[in-house]
């Protein structure tokens, strides 16, 4: 058997190496009995692209009768009709297989197969350099792909980390918001508790600062405790002078009453905002005209019978409340004291008549004028105690609200501490406090200022101007003027003490009766000396009242001198 063998190797533009081997055996056909051309084609394709496995295609086909006639000559004695049918079948199979072959082969495959191509076969064979180049390109592409993969993985991890961070931030924000809400709730609870404490302290302050009803001292058999007095509703006491007769209070009982009143004053906490007590609340004080003038009034009154004394014993005690235990106790004490002192008055009535007859009319007029002067001074002092009537106080600031309770605590611990020392301690404590500790007191200040504004919408703060006094042609400050008047009062008192012996500030009925039991001449001498002492004391009281009133009046006269107070 004779064969024709050829090999085709080429590299097309799409970087594919194709190798075609054609082996054409020439053998007689068994069916036809004549020679037949059988073409065996091996096709090898090597792909340079990554991930593509080379594909080997092997196809067997029978060539057409024309190509077979060119390559070999027919042999045998086959009939012509069978040969034509076979040729038709071959042409059909070749025509069906050619489109598939043309996809893998170039246009000049026939020329290359027949050896008519001008290009040498050595140009189409693959070399080692081209293979190394292609391997290098493949390695570079693999390296680039691994780098891209790493970048994608890092970006994915960064995105995942960013999402985790955002989630953590959201959780932190939620925790902060919850903590803030809890802190706000705690602060609100603390504010409510502090407001409750402030309200409780205000109630305690109002209970402590309620005015006390001063009761005259009674004998030990009929003492009245002050506990039921605090439980009862306290009614306002009018500040009007009430005439208390001398027989009501014994000298020893008066001393006890003054001591008890002082003890009550010191035991009470200091109240800077409270008004000074009126003179009628202290019946034992030496400044009230009724007690000081009662001996002379009894001398000038003429006859005094039991009916008039009983009328004086029934004092107007309606302001204490009718049916009150205190009122009943006072009335019983007055009746007891009146019963003890009625018999000596009847015995000494004649001596009083003789004493009044012996006194000159001028002394009686002086005594009455002194009585009116002291009454006017009492009214002036009451006006001063009333803070000039229409004066409106400023609302308390935060420091005053805080210092009110702290001052009370310090006074309870140290009752004898001076007010200036307490103020220094409170000022240093207030400066050392933080803003959070001061906050409730500032809120209380705002509440008080709003309340003050609602109560007095037209209020305007008008501070007192600094004033000076012109005394004997010299301009003096108010403090210097007060010191000068104090020295003058001391001089007048020292002169009075040298001229006449000292006497008690208040006269009792028993001391006067003891003096009247002596001779009438000695009584005259004692009455004159008592009038002298009273005149000196009244002059001192006049100076004190003028000193007190120096801030409110434009001009004050002292010892015949014109004193002008200027701004």
From Swiss-Prot:
The record, for InterPro entries, names: HMG_box_dom, HMG_box_dom_sf, SOX/SOX-like_TF
Which GO BP terms apply? cell fate commitment; regulation of transcription by RNA polymerase II
For this record, the Gene Ontology CC terms, alphabetical, are: nucleus
Identify the keywords attached in UniProt to this record, alphabetized. DNA-binding, Nucleus, Transcription, Transcription regulation
UniProt KW ATP-binding keyword: no
Which SMART domains does the record associate with it?
HMG
Positions of the DNA-binding region: 392-460
Q: Which domain of life is it from?
A: Eukaryota
Q: Does the keyword DNA-binding apply?
A: yes
Distribution of this protein across tissues and organs? Expression is highest in the ovary, with weak expression in other adult tissues.
* One Gene Ontology term of the molecular function aspect: sequence-specific DNA binding
Query: Which residues lie within the region annotated Disordered?
Result: 66-86, 249-307, 490-513
Positions the record marks as coiled coil are none
Subcellular localization is given as:
Nucleus
What is this protein's function per UniProt?
Transcription factor that binds to DNA at the consensus sequence 5'-AACAAT-3'.
Q: Subunit comment for this entry?
A: Homodimer.
Protein name (Swiss-Prot/TrEMBL): Transcription factor Sox-13
Q: Which organism is it from?
A: Xenopus laevis
Recorded name of the encoding gene: sox13
